[in-house]
Amino acid sequence: MILRHFGFILIILTVYLSSTHATTRKHHRRSIDNDARNLGFQFVMEPRRNVTVMESSSHLLECSYVLAHERLVHDVRIEWKRDGVLLSERTSSRIKVMSNGSLWIESVSSAEEGTYQCAVHVTTKSDQTSDTWTFLSRKATLRLADLAKFELQAIDRTLAKGQPTAFHCLINSKPTPTAVWLHNDEPIVNGGEYHILPVSNTLEISSTQSRHEGTYRCTVEGAGKRRSSQTARLTVTTETVSNELVFITTPRLQVVEQGDEFLLECLVASLIRPQVRWLKDSRQIIVDGVRIRRVGVSSILVSRASIEDTGLYTCRASNNDDSIDRAVSVEVRAPPRITTRPTTKVAVETADVELECGTAAARPEARVNWYKNGEAIIGSEYFVIEPNRLRILGVVRADQAIYQCIAENDVGSEQASAQLLVDAPDSSSVAASSGVPMTSSAPLGLRSTSSGSRFINVEWDPPVQRNGNIMRYHIFYKDNLIDRERMINSSSTSATLTSLQPSTMYLIRVTAENEAGMGKFSDSLKVTTNKEQAVPGKVASLTTTATGPETIDIRWSPPSGGQPALRYKIFYSHDPLEKNEKETLITTSTTHYTLHGMDKYTGYQIRIEAEGSNGSGLSSDTVKVRTQSDEPSAPPVNIQAEADSSTSVRVSWDEPEEESVNGEITGYRLKYKTKARGAKGNTLVIDATAREYTMGNLEPNTQYLIRMAVVNHNGTGPFSDWVSIDTPGQDKEERTLGAPREIRPHAGIDYILVSWLPPADEQNLVRGYQIGWGLSVPDTETIRVTASTTQYKIARLHSERDYVISLRAFNNLGSGFPIYETVRTLSRETPSHFNEDSDSDDSDVGSSESTPVGVRAEAISATSIRVMWTESDETAFNTQYTVRYSTAVDGNQHRYVNSTETWATVEGLRPATEYEFAVRAVASNGQLSTWSMATRNRTLAAPPSSAPRDLTVLPAESGDPHSSSLHWQPPKYSNGEIEEYLVFYTDRASLADKDWTINYVAGDKLSHQVSNLLPKANYFFKIQARNEKGHGPFSSVVGYTPSGGAILSGKDRHNARGHGSAASGDTVSLVDQLQSLLHSNPLYLILLAAFALILILTLILIIMCCWKRSSGGGRKNGYQSGKKTSAGAGSGGGIGGLGGPPNDLWINGTGSHMRAGASDYMVDGLATAHLTAADIESPTPRYHHLQGQGTLTRSYHQSSQSLEGRQRTPQVVYTGTGRHQPIQRIDFESPYGSSSAIGSASTPPLPMQAPPSGPPTVIDGYRTLRGTPPNSSAANALRSFTQLAGATPPPPHSAASSSSRPTIIAAGGRQVPVGRATAQPRVNVANIYSPFASCSASSDAGESDKKSGECMEMRETTPIKSNTAGSSNGEKMNTNMNPSHSAEDLNAHLENLDTMLDDLQQLQHNLHFETSMDK
């Protein structure tokens, strides 16, 4: 038992010692840092890359180094090469190698020009071997300085006074020569009016004057030489210069080296000095004044150029009218720079070694060459040269050397080196205590399982004696005719040898490795690869050149080896490769081909295969190329304009699709103008990085048209359609915003579509909206949108969750009040709300049929939408589909379309209408699937199919007779958003539509004012609507004749509108028509004068008859006329104050239908009061008249001077009580707004009698009211009078009633007391509606000696005063006046007068008709 334990411990100790010894062996291996063979070579000084020296001068090319380990160094030798040829001091006495390795050249001549390189040879010796290591420096180019010829010289110039100009003096030489300018052979001093630009030596004059005329030339000195330019003459004229932009100098194409400076010239002439900006690759250059500074008038100088300065530079000059661009490319060339250097390595024979050499970006692109001990390496089967990498396969002892990568281009070169040390395979092994080796035995049974022309598969069995764990197997193989052996590793007992040569015998052997190292080798296996069919090799010298925006030229050379090529296959695709894109194949038999129809400014990758009789050979390397740029082919998209204030508009847009830009965007061109005909447009050029721009200094209350185009280096693309925007008349205020008026959410499974209406206060400025949402709480997430946005889709939500949505508007004062809405997203089992309907066919829905997925709708036209979907069941057969669609316009009424394909076209839709679609599958057995998720889309717009409605023409609100106001309603079928209305008008209806005058009105306006109309001329109006697709039909023509009267005041216009004086839009007043008719027909003037004379005589006759009857003493039971007093103090009671009894005919001698002067307010026993139009504003009638009270209806048009167009005065209503009444008061504070609603507050209405329905509304030429005596019936009233409808009945006669003061109710805010009223009032409407109404009152005959009447007169602000003279005069008249014998006589006269007025009205209609016919 003890022995067994002892044996176990011994075994463990043996294994531990073995592993310790193996570890010790590994640790004793030499480190590269401590290896004496590692020289640690490094160049301290290398020759400069490019050197320019003066002829016959001396120059030193430096070359010095250091060695980290010199113990084994035996000798160091330095050599110089010129253009790859070794230099010797023996062949040239002017060349000498210094002790530190530098090269000294004396008296440099053209023979010494070339490329120089230093080579350092280091020889080391050890006990066994001697090795030579060679290091190469970078290359240096030596050139002689020279003064080249002029590239640009001064030319004659003639220009206007005050314009800038420039003269060139360009020589491209190094070093840069010095220049001197001469004006009339006198030197010019730089500064002030003259600017001599650096680098190019251009002379600029910022503002030419007469003193600048003369000759100009420059003299240049450099490289020991001197040159003079040609002489140019400057002529200054006094001609007027246009505002057109013209380039004087433009930037030129330049290639500069890193670290140098370059000048970009740009000088532009115009009437007004333009603004000049510089852009680099569409971004504006910031002139910092240090590295980039402005020189001259508008040129820029860039110092210390770097690769980042390479690009396209654009000089952009602009003024208010236009802008011009001139672009030029600048290439900054830089020498290569090695970023990843190869490292010194120690390798074991048969191993593979990789050396990396990575370079940074260089212009032009650097070439990397590999050198072994100063000799160029040519790629082979064992030296594989890859980009930035060198692979050495199967390292042998001869591969030990210095490996260098040298990157070089036309500017310079850079080198990096590494030392490769090669050791023999490690043969040491670990022996056990018995002396038996611990490595494994040889693997057994090595065999080949398969082989081809380029590969061999081998297998073997593990060794019998493993002596530990087998860590890996090493497979060695080599060409039977070559000593270089290669090795690969495998962790299993099989391997595949690749990259072999066809028809070649290979020797293969295997060994196993355990903890002690590699074991014994197996016996070698000989395997011969198969013969390969002869195919062409790779094509050589593949080059691609973009010859245009859509063409690429491809050229190559035939393959150098293999079978001859019969044809070539060209493969090309986009770079980078688009999704699911495949290469395009073109076959050709020539070694060049031109691709046509390529995308503009698009990258492509191209490769070529040569094809022989046995198939295609290896593909060439892929070459990338980009087609040339071109002018943009599309304008910006999503252009929106929004008024920021009354003088500024903010425009926003998105860049077009990338494939339509055709280059790099350098800016956006924005044109804007007013909508007025012949308006001059303005042009702005905006930076390419901008997505919005604010235009300022605009006119308030003006409509502007805006359109945009994309600008690139090739020019300006097409402009967009005009976008209209109206600036407000006044700036909106920024106050705290109210909540949006409405929020309408629409929920889906994982989204919520939110739409809203803006706040109600349109005068409050809204700068945007903030939308917030969250699960059960608002504002967990928020986003802000612009003020013009009224819809937003909230995506990436969870299904079947309650979300609280908040919406608030904001401006500079902050966020306004929010509005909230709670919405629940849909369930995934309920794809859309279509499943919630109650259609009968939904009852048959089964679950066995799969639901269509991926439903999408694509608008085809204005009346059709194509619906497409994907069948989710790939095994479905003979399936039919039902498409259901609806729109909110029809109340979401469902309609259906059937299809047997996975698409359907729905026809007969409304233009510009959003529809919702869902699809379900119908199996052959009749089973139905559930409805798919709903999708929405909108049909395309179409021109309006109906005209604007209800076109109405009214007088202008301002009262201007030269203007009219048009009102209309939108078309019933607009077929899209109305962009504008076209108002056509003319004074000749027979003209063609193109000859009518057109006014353009924004689509959101429904009214427009037309100005500059001629009074009394017939105008015809019609209107047309336009949307984005075109114009709609015309509305019906509406005629209108502007009046020629004076401009009415605000109150008069209100009265005129209220009584139809101009409301019809196609009529004029009677007076205007008569005036027009009389001017054109003198005969009518004679007839009218005769008629007026007859009318006057008739009136005189009637007055005389009435006077005789009243003075002759009539019957006692006759009609008792009321007494009245003249309106004016001291005037008589007759017509015109002549003293006779006043007439009661309501017609004066001026031809008006109602008296315009001071008239009677005929109430017995009352004094007279005057009311002016300025005192009382005419109220809108609130009560209606009753035709049943004997109202005589008159229907004819009124002039602007008629009584109906004048200011109303309060009406007096009497209570019907005793003759003695308290003084009435006019209540201007009454809410009734009418002077006809009269009565005491204490007077109750009659039982079962409706309240007053309104005053007698005057819609005719005149209307008269007269009270009815208490003892007479209403039916016995005169035809020319009417009893006040619904009059308040008389209250009981008592002290209370006698002490109450009746009130006249009117608007105006004052209570005016008037005279007393009798129980039988007689009211004359001529007085009520006269601007100077009078009221008179006289006491009864029995009371004439006790109390006299008072006459009150109202003026603008003067209180009513009693008219004593008028009162006494009235009493005298009352004493002398006899009562009328009969009321029937007066009625007869009045009936005759009514007949005459009817005849006058008929005459007026006849005259109007004849006038219309003449026109």
Swiss-Prot record:
Interacts with netrin unc-6. Interacts with eva-1. Interacts (via fibronectin type-III domain) with drag-1. One of its GO terms (molecular function) is netrin receptor activity. The lineage of its organism: Eukaryota, Metazoa, Ecdysozoa, Nematoda, Chromadorea. This is Netrin receptor unc-40. Residues 1-22 form the signal peptide. GO terms for biological process: axon guidance; axon midline choice point recognition; cell projection morphogenesis; cell-cell adhesion; chemorepulsion of axon; dendrite morphogenesis; determination of left/right asymmetry in nervous system; distal tip cell migration. The keyword Transmembrane applies. Residues 1104-1415 are cytoplasmic. Keywords: Cell membrane, Disulfide bond, Immunoglobulin domain, Membrane, Neurogenesis, Repeat, Signal, Transmembrane, Transmembrane helix. PANTHER family: FRAZZLED, TITIN. It is a single-pass type I membrane protein. Residues 23-1082 are extracellular. Receptor for netrin unc-6 required for asymmetric axon formation, axon guidance and cell migrations. Required during axon formation, in response to unc-6, to initiate, maintain and orient asymmetric neuronal growth, and may signal via phosphoinositide 3-kinase (PI3K). Mediates axon attraction of neuronal growth cones in the developing nervous system upon ligand binding. Axon migration is mediated by the secreted unc-6, which promotes attraction of neurons and axons through binding to the unc-40 receptor, while repulsion requires both unc-5 and unc-40 receptors. GO terms for cellular component: axonal growth cone; cell projection membrane; membrane; plasma membrane; receptor complex. Residues 442-532, 538-630, 635-730, 739-830, 851-944, 947-1046 form the Fibronectin type-III domain. Residues 1244-1255 have a biased composition (Pro residues). The gene is unc-40.
